[in-house]
Regions:
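Juxtamembrane intracellular "pre-TM" segments in multi-pass secondary transporters
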Residues: 2-19, 199-232, 415-418
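Substrate-agnostic recognition of the 12-TM MFS/MFS-like secondary transporter fold
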Residues: 20-40, 59-77, 81-96, 113-172, ...
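Residue-level recognition of membrane-helix boundary sites in multi-pass small-molecule transporters
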Residues: 21, 53-54, 84, 113, ...
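Small-residue hotspots at the loop-to-helix junctions and early N-terminal turns
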Residues: 39, 49-59, 150, 260-267, ...
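Short amphipathic helix-loop junctions that connect adjacent transmembrane helices
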Residues: 39-52, 246-260
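Transmembrane alpha-helix termini and helix-breaking/packing motifs in multi-pass membrane transporters
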Residues: 43-47, 101-106, 162-182, 254-255, ...
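C-terminal transmembrane bundle of multi-pass solute transporters/carriers
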Residues: 67-68, 79, 85, 89, ...
Length: 418
């Protein structure tokens, strides 16, 4: 059946057996991940009497390892067996989620437990992300890389569609514990899926010999103004604009005075938009159009502002899918551009630096957003995040307006000689 998939179609990456295995397992993992995110936020609000500052701190602690370890994860991605490394990172993530679930169900959990386990999960996630990103090209080959990235994003956001609603109903019926246990199980499933991959069906990449250092990766980026433009845009758009998780929790509880089920529905609403954005991206190849990314971020910033001024819960929920669509088209375009236009020999390190840019500001931004929401309210905080995103996109467009193309030769040697 899969051999008949159109080689030019939206689902062409599913022709690869290894990709099908990972894709199926990732669906369960993505549902579990989003279920845990909702449950963890709700647990923090329960333990701290709806204090947004604590919510920001927990988010920051989970992303702090990204700031400290994502670049090292990128170095590992260029040196180690990626499949074996991903088995280890998912085992660690599963144990972390299992521990939080058991502590919660036995009713001994406190905010310190959440802090510690958020850091542990963050450590494994920080190492996993650049290795997994660099591994995709080995699973499907470079011709199908962009399509595989888009389908993975669609998978992730389908999980975002199901996970929050599932978690909302589980919280209402049984409390937050079951969501953590589901996530633990999902990590163990994808761990075994990596073990089931056939090594002889992986696509070996021709890799030139390089230093293998972060210094070399930074020198490469210094010569690539197209990559600089994307990193500048994404740093501000992701670390300030992409805070719907915190925004939704605070708007649901403090502005619209809703319960767990309604909060979970907001996560589903934004997932409708992000899933649509991922499927649209699977049809379009923008890997040769770097200027599209700051333009997309500009559009995204406008829809973040629309969230800030939404007068009712219903209107807020209706704006979320559009916000999600604009966010996803921005982020997936940036991610696929970085992978498709980085040399094989340095891709892991470039993606490690990109992950740092993408999420590394969260440990700083999340507490600030949580604190600001306590001082000036969620609406003004969201408006401020929108303003920062808009300004960053405009600055990137102005500074790099003449850098809208990919170099003819992206090899490490050629770029460093230029």
């Amino acid at each position: 059946m899969f051999s008949k998939i159109n080689e030019e179609g939206n689902w062409r990456s599913l022709r690869h057996r290894n990709f099908r295995i990972l894709y199926a397992a990732a669906l369960l993992t993505n549902i579990g991940t989003w279920a845990q995110r909702i449950a963890q936020d709700w647990l923090v609000l329960e333990l701290t009497h709806n204090n947004g500052t604590y919510l920001g701190i927990v988010t920051a602690l989970q992303f702090l390892p990204v700031m400290l370890l994502s670049m090292q994860g990128g170095v590992l991605a260029d040196k180690v067996n990626k499949k074996k490394a991903l088995v280890i990172t998912n085992l660690g993530s599963g144990i972390s989620a299992l521990a939080l679930g058991l502590l919660t169900i036995t009713k001994v959990v406190n905010i310190d437990h959440v802090y510690i386990l958020a850091i542990l999960l963050g450590i494994f996630s920080a190492l996993d992300a650049p290795i997994r990103s660099a591994f995709i090209v080995e699973v499907v080959g470079k011709p199908d890389l962009t399509n595989a990235m888009s389908l993975n994003s669609a998978n992730f956001h389908f999980g975002r569609l199901i996970g929050p609603t599932l978690s909302g109903f589980l919280i209402a019926a049984f409390g937050t514990g079951p969501s953590f246990l589901i996530n633990a199980f999902s990590f163990f499933v994808i761990m075994f899926s990596f073990m089931a991959l056939r090594d002889d069906e992986l696509h070996e990449q021709k890799i030139e010999k390089t230093e293998g250092t972060l210094k070399e990766a930074f020198a490469y980026i210094k010569k690539r103004r197209d990559i600089q433009m994307i990193m500048l845009t994404i740093f501000f758009a992701s670390n300030f604009g992409l805070n719907a998780q915190i925004f939704n929790a605070l708007m649901a509880t403090k502005v619209f005075h809703k319960g767990a089920a309604s909060y979970g529905f907001l996560g589903t609403a934004i997932a409708v938009g992000t899933l649509t954005g991922a499927l649209v991206s699977a049809r379009k190849d923008r890997t040769k159009r770097p200027l599209f990314i700051p333009l997309a971020a500009l559009n995204f910033g406008i829809w973040v502002m629309a969230l800030a001024i939404a007068p009712t819960y219903l209107i807020y929920a209706l704006v979320l899918p559009i916000n999600g669509f604009s966010a996803l088209t921005t982020m997936i375009s940036a991610n696929t551009y970085m992978q498709a236009n980085s040399d094989n020999a340095i891709r892991g390190r470039i993606m490690g630096i990109y992950m740092f840019i993408f999420m590394g500001g969260t440990p700083i931004g999340s507490p600030l957003i949580g604190y600001a929401s306590q001082q000036i309210g969620p609406r003004w905080t969201i408006a401020g995040c929108s303003f920062i995103t808009l300004i960053a996109a405009l600055v990137a467009l102005f500074i790099y307006r003449n850098d809208g193309k990919v170099p003819e030769d992206i090899s490490v040697a050629a770029v460093l000689r230029s």
